[in-house]
C-alpha cells in the first residue's frame, strides 16, 4: 500500500513509500547478542520524472530502514532522506545522490517511542 510521496527539490525524481510489504531485508540496527542479523524492511521506491511528458521510470526500490514507513522527507538540498518507521519505533537518515535519486548508506538512526502505537509517523528536516 502506497503511503507517502515526496517530490525532490529539483523535481527530477519522485519517491514513494510502501507499507506492509516487508519484502526487503537490512542489517539489524540492534547489535546486542540476542538480536537477529537481519530485519524486514518495506521499500522506498524512486522514479525519474521525464521533463518533457511527465512519465515515470523506475530508478530503484530501496529499503526504508524497517517496517511501516509512515512518513519521510528530504533536506533542502536533497542530499539526505529521513524515514519514520512506525512499527520499529525508528527514524533512519540515508545519504541521497541528487544526480541519480538513489539512496546511499545510513548516516544516522534513532529509536523513537515504544510499541506499534507510539512509533513515529512523520519526520521533517528543520533547516
Regions found by a protein language model. Name each.
Residues 1-127:
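Feature marking well-ordered beta-strand scaffolds used for ligand recognition
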Amino acid at each position: 500500500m502506497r503511503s507517502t510521496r515526496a517530490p525532490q527539490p529539483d523535481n527530477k525524481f519522485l519517491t514513494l513509500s510502501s507499507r506492509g510489504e516487508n519484502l526487503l531485508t537490512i542489517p539489524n540496527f540492534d547489535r546486542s547478542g540476542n538480536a537477529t542479523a537481519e530485519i524486514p524492511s518495506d521499500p522506498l521506491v524512486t522514479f525519474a520524472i521525464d521533463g518533457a511528458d511527465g512519465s515515470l521510470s523506475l530508478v530503484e526500490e530501496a529499503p526504508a530502514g524497517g517496517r511501516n514507513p509512515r512518513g519521510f522527507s528530504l533536506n533542502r538540498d536533497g542530499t539526505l532522506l529521513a524515514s519514520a518507521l512506525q512499527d520499529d519505533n525508528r527514524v533512519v537518515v540515508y545519504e541521497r545522490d541528487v544526480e541519480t535519486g538513489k539512496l546511499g548508506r545510513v548516516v544516522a538512526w534513532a529509536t523513537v517511542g515504544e510499541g506499534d502505537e507510539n512509533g513515529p509517523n512523520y519526520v521533517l528536516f528543520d533547516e
